[in-house]
């Protein structure tokens, strides 16, 4: 029984060994043959002003986190809005007013953040 199972899976084992060996050879060749010259474009700072090879634990402005949180909130708003828009023909008046209140709360929150200066980048 064991020899029968071994003979059935021998081709799979050979395939895995061959693919592992081939991937190691390809990775090794790309490492040996690739040019290691860093060009000036790769070393230039990102659009946000950070250098690509600085310490990752450096000082980081808190406003980036605020913008990220605001993006997530409004991205989730869109994620909730898509299924509602797809099923708009089947939505009752209760569903319409529920979405209207949802959008109104988010709009009031956005105006509040704007008035408090959360979106100002001084």
From Swiss-Prot:
Keyword Iron: no
Topological category with respect to the lipid bilayer: Multi-pass membrane protein
Positions of transmembrane segments: 12-32, 66-86, 91-111
Xref: InterPro entries: NAD(P)H_OxRDtase_bac/plastid (IPR023043), NADH_UbQ/plastoQ_OxRdtase_su3 (IPR000440), NDAH_ubi_oxred_su3_sf (IPR038430)
EC number annotated for this UniProt entry: 7.1.1.2
GO CC annotations on file: mitochondrial membrane; NADH dehydrogenase complex
Gene3D superfamilies: NADH:ubiquinone/plastoquinone oxidoreductase, chain 3
A Gene Ontology molecular function term of the record: NADH dehydrogenase (ubiquinone) activity
Catalyses which reaction(s): a ubiquinone + NADH + 5 H(+)(in) = a ubiquinol + NAD(+) + 4 H(+)(out)
The UniProt record lists the keyword Methyltransferase: no
Top-level taxon: Eukaryota
Cellular compartment(s): Mitochondrion membrane
Keywords in alphabetical order: Electron transport, Membrane, Mitochondrion, NAD, Respiratory chain, Translocase, Transmembrane, Transmembrane helix, Transport, Ubiquinone
UniProt family annotation: Belongs to the complex I subunit 3 family.
HAMAP family, sorted: NDH1_NuoA (MF_01394)
Role according to the record: Core subunit of the mitochondrial membrane respiratory chain NADH dehydrogenase (Complex I) that is believed to belong to the minimal assembly required for catalysis. Complex I functions in the transfer of electrons from NADH to the respiratory chain. The immediate electron acceptor for the enzyme is believed to be ubiquinone.
Protein name from the UniProt record: NADH-ubiquinone oxidoreductase chain 3
Organism (species): Reclinomonas americana
């Amino acid at each position: 029984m064991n020899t029968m199972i071994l003979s059935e899976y021998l081709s799979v084992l050979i395939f895995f060994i061959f693919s592992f060996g081939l991937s190691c050879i390809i990775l090794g060749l790309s490492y040996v043959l690739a040019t290691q010259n860093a060009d000036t474009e790769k070393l230039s700072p990102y659009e946000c002003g950070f250098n690509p090879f600085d310490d990752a634990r450096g000082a980081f402005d808190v406003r980036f986190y605020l913008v990220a949180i605001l993006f997530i909130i409004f991205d989730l708003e869109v994620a909730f809005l898509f299924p509602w828009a797809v099923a708009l023909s089947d939505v009752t008046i209760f569903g319409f007013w529920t979405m209207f209140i949802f959008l109104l709360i988010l709009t009031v929150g956005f105006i509040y953040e704007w008035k408090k200066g959360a979106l100002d980048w001084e």
